[in-house]
A protein has these predicted regions:
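Short, structured active-site-proximal loop/turn typified by the sulfatase FGly-forming signature C/S-X-P-X-R
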Residues: 35-76, 121-123
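His/Asp/Glu-rich, glycine-adjacent segments
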Residues: 77-161
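A residue-level signal for conserved active-site and pocket-lining positions in enzyme catalytic cores
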Residues: 27, 73, 115
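Active-site-proximal N-terminal segment of extracellular/periplasmic enzymes that hydrolyze or transfer
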Residues: 3-54
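Short phosphate-engaging motifs
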Residues: 30, 45, 65, 107, ...
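Glycine-/proline-rich flexible loop or hinge segments
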Residues: 28-32, 51-57, 65-69, 87-100
Length: 161
C-alpha cells in the first residue's frame, strides 16, 4: 500500500513519518521531576531519548484528569471537541457515575485512526486498560496493521500469526 504524504485529523495536518515514529506520553507529573531524575542518573533511557529525539512539554487541558488529557493528545483537540470531559460523568437517569472509557463518548477521531486509515501500521500501548478502547478507536485488528494493549492487562495479551 502506498502511503500518502500527510494525514488530516480534526482540522490539523500531520506529515507521514519517513520512518517508524514513536510517541511516549508521561502524564501526571511535574516536568522538573524528570529533569532531576535525569540529572541524578536515574533515567538514562529518557535522557538518551531527549538527546536524540524530540522532547515536548504539553500544557494540561482543564479538567486536569487522565482521560481528557490523553484524548486531547490523541485527537489534537480539546475536550469540548473530542467529548471526553472527565474520567467519569454523572448519569442523571440512573443517579450513578459512569466511567468515560467507552468509545460512544468520543466525538472526534484519534490521530492514530487517521494514520491507520491512510495505510500506516499503528501500535498503541497504554498503562491503564481504561484508556485502551478510546485510544484505539477506529483501528481494525484483523488486518495485521494494528495492535493495542494495556500494560495493566499484558498478562492476558497474545498475538497469533
Amino acid at each position: 500500500m502506498t502511503l500518502v504524504p500527510h494525514v488530516i485529523a480534526n482540522e490539523r495536518t500531520y506529515p507521514m513519518p519517513k520512518r517508524c515514529a514513536i510517541a511516549i506520553c508521561l502524564d501526571g507529573c511535574e516536568p522538573e521531576y524528570l529533569d532531576v531524575a535525569i540529572a541524578e542518573g536515574l533515567m538514562p533511557n529518557l535522557k538518551m531519548m531527549r538527546e536524540t529525539g524530540t522532547d515536548r512539554i504539553a500544557h494540561s487541558v482543564i479538567p486536569s484528569f487522565t482521560n481528557p488529557n490523553k484524548l486531547s493528545i490523541a485527537t489534537g483537540r480539546p475536550p469540548a471537541v473530542h467529548g471526553i470531559c472527565g474520567n467519569y460523568l454523572f448519569d442523571p437517569d440512573t443517579g450513578e457515575e459512569v466511567m468515560m472509557n467507552d468509545v460512544r463518548f468520543l466525538r472526534a477521531p484519534t490521530v492514530f485512526s487517521r494514520f491507520y486509515e491512510a495505510g500506516a501500521r499503528v501500535a498503541m500501548v497504554t498503562a491503564k486498560d481504561k484508556l485502551r478502547a478510546l485510544l484505539s478507536a477506529g483501528l481494525k485488528f484483523d488486518e495485521g496493521r494494528a495492535i493495542a494493549f494495556s500494560a495493566e492487562r499484558a498478562d492476558e495479551t497474545s498475538v497469533a500469526n
